[in-house]
C-alpha cells in the first residue's frame, strides 16, 4: 500500500526568553503534584494549513486562557496588507481563521506575544476522500496492538483508512509505525502525524477536565486538515474495540443521513469471543455500545 505519509505539522511556542506564558485555569488546590510538569504553558500553535475552497488559513492550538486579550488583538499581515482575522476559544483548544486574498507563501501574525511567520501549507483533502477512517491519538502503544485494533475495525466496521496522531512515541520510529499500519490488509490510506506536544494533566476527582489540550487540538486538526471529504470517521483509543449490541456501525451509519453520531458504553468493558480472535494485548477490551443519533 503506497498511500502512506508521515506529516510534520508546523507549530510555534513562546521562546524561553518571553515574559509571557499560559497559566492554568484550574484552582491550585485542585492541581496534583505533577501538574506543572505536565501543563503546556508555552505552545501557541499546533498546526497551520490552507483551505483552498474557503481561501482561508486555519491555525490550531491550545486555548489562550490568560493570553486571550493579546490573541484577540492579533493582526495578520501579507504583502503589506492587513487581513481579516477570527479568533475562537473552544473546548480545550483554539482556532484562528485568516481570510486570505490570493495565496501568499506566508502570513505574519503580529501581537504582544511577538511576530509569528506562518507558512502556507495546503490541507490534505484527497487522501481520505470517500474513506471510512479510523482516527486516534497514540503514544507508545505496541505496533502489534495497533495492527490488531485496525484489523478488528476493518473487519467489523469497514474501516479502510487510518489517521494516527503520534504523541512522541519512543518505542519505535514514525517510519516503523507508518509501515506497520500500511501492511495491514484492507487499509488503502495511512497518515501518521507527528504530534509531539505535552498531553496535559488529566482531570482531578472526577472533574476539572480543563488542561488536557493535546487531544482536543489533534481532533480539531484532523477535522479540518484531513477529514472533510471522508465518508465516515470512527474515533476510539487503541485499547478500545467497538462492538455494538444490535448491528455493525457500518450498517447503522448507512441507514442514517450524514451526521455526527455518538455512542455510550454499557458501563463496563469485557473481552468476547469476537474480540479475542484479534487481540494479542491482554488489556484490550471490548466496549459494548449503544448507538445514538
Model-derived segments and their meaning:
Residues 136-151, 167-168:
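Active-site beta-to-alpha loop of glycosyltransferases that engages the nucleotide-sugar donor
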Amino acid at each position: 500500500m503506497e498511500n502512506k505519509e508521515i506529516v510534520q505539522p508546523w507549530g510555534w511556542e513562546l521562546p524561553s526568553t518571553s515574559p509571557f506564558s499560559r497559566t492554568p485555569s484550574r484552582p491550585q488546590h485542585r492541581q496534583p503534584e505533577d501538574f506543572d510538569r505536565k501543563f503546556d504553558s508555552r505552545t501557541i500553535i499546533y498546526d497551520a494549513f490552507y483551505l483552498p475552497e474557503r481561501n482561508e488559513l486555519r491555525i490550531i492550538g491550545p486555548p489562550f486562557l490568560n493570553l486571550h486579550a493579546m490573541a484577540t488583538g492579533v493582526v495578520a499581515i501579507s504583502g503589506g496588507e492587513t487581513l481579516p482575522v477570527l479568533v475562537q476559544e473552544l473546548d480545550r483548544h483554539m482556532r484562528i481563521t485568516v481570510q486570505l486574498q490570493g495565496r501568499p507563501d506566508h502570513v505574519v501574525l503580529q501581537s504582544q506575544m511577538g511576530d509569528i511567520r506562518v507558512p502556507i501549507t495546503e490541507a490534505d483533502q484527497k487522501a481520505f476522500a470517500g474513506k471510512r477512517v479510523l482516527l486516534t491519538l497514540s503514544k507508545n502503544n505496541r505496533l502489534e496492538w495497533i495492527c490488531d485494533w485496525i484489523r478488528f475495525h476493518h473487519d467489523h466496521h469497514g474501516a479502510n483508512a487510518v489517521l494516527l496522531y503520534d504523541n512522541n512515541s519512543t518505542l519505535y520510529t514514525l517510519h516503523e509505525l507508518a509501515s506497520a499500519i500500511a501492511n495491514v490488509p484492507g487499509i488503502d490510506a495511512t497518515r501518521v502525524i507527528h504530534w509531539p506536544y505535552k498531553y496535559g494533566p488529566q482531570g482531578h476527582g472526577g472533574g476539572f477536565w480543563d488542561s488536557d489540550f493535546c487531544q482536543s487540538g489533534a481532533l480539531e486538526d484532523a477535522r479540518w486538515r484531513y477529514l472533510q471529504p471522508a465518508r465516515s470517521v470512527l474515533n476510539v483509543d487503541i485499547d478500545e474495540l467497538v462492538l455494538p449490541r444490535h448491528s455493525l456501525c457500518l450498517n447503522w451509519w448507512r441507514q442514517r443521513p450524514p451526521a455526527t453520531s455518538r455512542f455510550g458504553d454499557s458501563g463496563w468493558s469485557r473481552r468476547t469471543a469476537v474480540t479475542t480472535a484479534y487481540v494479542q494485548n491482554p488489556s484490550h477490551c471490548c466496549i459494548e455500545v449503544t448507538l445514538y443519533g
